[in-house]
Amino acid sequence: MIIVLSPAKSLDYDTPAHVPSYTKPAFVDDASELIDGLRKLSPQDIATLMDISDPLARLNFQRYADWSPTFSPANAKQAVLAFNGDVYEGFDAKSLSAADLDYAQQHVRVLSGLYGLLRPLDLLQPYRLEMGTRFANARGKDLYAFWGDRITRALNEQLETRSGAARVLVNCASTEYFKSVKPKLLAAPVVTPVFEDWKGGRYKIISFHAKRARGLMARYIVENRIAEPAALKDFAMEDYVFDAAASNDSTYVYRRRIGE
């Protein structure tokens, strides 16, 4: 089983890492190519391209200038400890044991606009480059064209080491990021957990709740060493319950009803 997550825009480089081990990203050469292109942009260009504020554009202009193809704990931090958004609050890597993080290293992957595909302990230099950014490059009009089938092939290398029901990809990423994966080329079926909350008289996806829940699901898989998708139906964290009637073989729906 391989779980894919989206990255986070919010980053934490202030909290010291609680584990010393780290690895190097697989696609550093590709990231360097993107950085070379990003360095040609002015802060105003970045603000327009990414639809962000001027201060945030200046911050990322400097990040691109500072970025180095040489990674070390002096200029980078393990990805799963650096990302700091809703998904990673749910995953809460800071409270995972070294053994859990080692398991995550084998089973969790993070999709990234700049880095392509990251393992949890891959060192990450600070950046902002969302996968949906229409950043024209030598390979095409956007980042989906840039990455092509590279991410899918890297996932297949891992999936092909699994067998039977354990050869499955669990999609805990957003639609924007999972578009960088080509399911028809994957060497495994895809199961997508969907999290819905009761609001306004019906169940619906509420973005920040769903993001946190996807992180919780990844944590649940890691802590319980889950290898086959059937066991995902037992997930019941923070009052979410599997709804068999709303689910099918490729979409597992979890619902929560609180306060109504």
UniProtKB/Swiss-Prot annotation:
GO terms for biological process: response to hydroperoxide. Signal peptide: none annotated. GO terms for cellular component: cytosol. InterPro entries: YaaA. It comes from the Bacteria. Belongs to the UPF0246 family. NCBIfam families: PRK02101.1-1 (NF002541), PRK02101.1-3 (NF002542). PANTHER family: PEROXIDE STRESS RESISTANCE PROTEIN YAAA (PTHR30283:SF4), PEROXIDE STRESS RESPONSE PROTEIN YAAA (PTHR30283). This is UPF0246 protein BamMC406_2140. The lineage of its organism: Bacteria, Pseudomonadati, Pseudomonadota, Betaproteobacteria, Burkholderiales.
